[in-house]
Amino acid sequence: MTQSYVYVGLAGETAPGRPVKSGLYRMAVGDDRWELATRGLPEAPAIRAIATHPEQAGTVYVGTQHGPYRSTDHGDHWEKVNIADHGLPVWSLLFDPRDPRVLYAGYENCEIFRSEDEGERWRELPVTVRFPEITVAPGSNPAKRVLKMAVNPANPDEIYGAVEVGGVLRSLDAGEHWECMSHGQYLNDDTVDTHGVLVGRWRPGTVFAIARAGLFTSTDQGGHWSSARIESLNSKGQTYCRDIREVPGDPKTIWVAAGSNFQSDVGALFRSKDGGASWSRVKMGVEPKTTMFALAFDPRQPRRMFCATNGGEVFASEDGGESWIERPLPAGATQVYAMGCA
């Protein structure tokens, strides 16, 4: 049987007062020991994105402050893929489910690159949507980071991007043209500070977006949005959502990682068992002490799942989230941004 590994990426925030941590940790499933897997990565690697190859378990891509890197041996060694380093970090990576040779990389400053040969050559896509098109605030800054991307498995030319304080972007032609799907949604920065996006497979046309203000649902490919009813976790009546994942092979079951704010003492998981029609908070049996930031599933055994807080707490479940055990990172390893499993 092929050995599965779980990966956790750390990246320091540069805002005043926030500590800088970085690195990539790896754990073999069935073991309880974490090890650094940074050979060949840049010094003090800031890992904000992890993408595991859908057909080759040993091939993993990570996004760093110096562009994407690739490993073909489960993270034992890394090499930089051939894309010009322009000084901005990679925040998201996405495989085309129809052709895993095709890979997208989402950068800071709302840039998206596409490779059609597993990262050997890259082309910047014409993303022209900017922050003022989403808000009505005069003199607003350009939209920032493409924090996550998602693709419609039934039509891989349909791609979405979640942009920090920039809403949701959509392309219907594999990235050649983009449009803003958040017009009219702006109430304040909270509603368009978008952290993730997911194309639901259970109901065609359904798209989910998570943000600082909570969870939003569209039933018309992002044309219109409504707020999902989930338990609020902060004084604003909001839930700070950071990751959203569908269980492999089970399109009715969707998970959301959340907390009360970016850095908080509340970490929570929410689950839908009906394709996103209703949501409930999961009783984990353990108490996360910081905001839940990331989720990952073992594609070969989807009932095996992992979650992590930005404070470095990692939890594992072998029964689809019914029970959890702690698998904490080494002391001092915090600022978790990304997870992957393969």
Predicted regions and their residues:
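Extracellular glycan-interacting surfaces
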Residues: 1-342
